[in-house]
């Protein structure tokens, strides 16, 4: 009897839950990226959902870009998200590495004009092996270029520039004059959480 009652409670609990369809932000087309289940709407908010950029845009060439979104708003059975970061797959990164060349990683924190802090990891791939001074010059140029550009953009503009590859193209044009450069990729981004203001009352 105890087992039957326990099973009944499990069925009841499952029936009490609802499915919510999850969508990307407006600037990424409000694309459907999956479903999540919950018994209460409030427990849906804050959940992290992932999808490849290829799935979002129906472009198989972008399957190597993994996008992360946080559910920020729920209306009916629809859950709307905000972008929290992206990362390029390791297999794709390995395919970019060539012998007798350098991969130069650069970690940059930028602040957008709508006051969002974003950490970016950029990889610069050269045709030949660069020395320490050349690597330093490339990192400085990438950092200065990104920080200056980000101040003129809001978060949505920055995200669009990252996923479209436009920012990478701009950085490539900037650094190729300093050292023979094969490719520049923004391989990772993360939107930093801003702490709530502390009340002084």
Swiss-Prot record:
Keyword terms, alphabetized: Ribonucleoprotein, Ribosomal protein
GO molecular function: structural constituent of ribosome
Gene Ontology annotations for the cellular component aspect, listed alphabetically: ribonucleoprotein complex; ribosome
SMART domains: Ribosomal_S3Ae
Biological processes per GO annotation: translation
UniProt keyword Ribosomal protein, yes or no: yes
A matching Pfam family: Ribosomal_S3Ae
Keyword match Cytoplasm: no
Family from the record: Belongs to the eukaryotic ribosomal protein eS1 family.
Name of the protein this chain belongs to: Small ribosomal subunit protein eS1
Species per Swiss-Prot/TrEMBL record: Methanoregula boonei (strain DSM 21154 / JCM 14090 / 6A8)
Gene that this sequence comes from: rps3ae
């Amino acid at each position: 009897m105890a087992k039957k009652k326990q099973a009944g409670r499990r069925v009841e609990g499952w029936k009490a839950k609802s499915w919510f369809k999850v969508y990307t932000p407006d600037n990424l087309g409000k694309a459907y990226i999956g479903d999540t289940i919950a018994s209460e709407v409030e427990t849906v908010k804050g959940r992290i959902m992932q999808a490849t950029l290829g799935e979002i845009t129906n472009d198989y060439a972008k399957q190597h870009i993994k996008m992360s979104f946080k559910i920020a708003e729920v209306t009916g059975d629809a859950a709307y998200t905000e972008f929290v970061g992206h990362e390029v797959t390791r297999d794709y990164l390995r395919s970019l590495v060539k012998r007798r060349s350098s991969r130069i990683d650069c970690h940059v924190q930028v602040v957008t004009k709508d006051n969002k802090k974003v950490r970016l990891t950029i990889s610069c791939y050269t045709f030949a092996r660069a020395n320490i001074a050349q690597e330093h010059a490339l990192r400085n140029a990438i950092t200065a270029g990104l920080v200056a550009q980000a101040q003129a953009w809001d978060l949505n503009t920055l995200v669009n520039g990252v996923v479209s590859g436009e920012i990478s193209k701009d950085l490539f044009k900037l650094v190729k004059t300093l050292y023979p450069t094969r490719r520049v990729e923004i391989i990772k981004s993360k939107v930093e959480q801003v702490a709530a203001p502390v009340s002084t009352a």
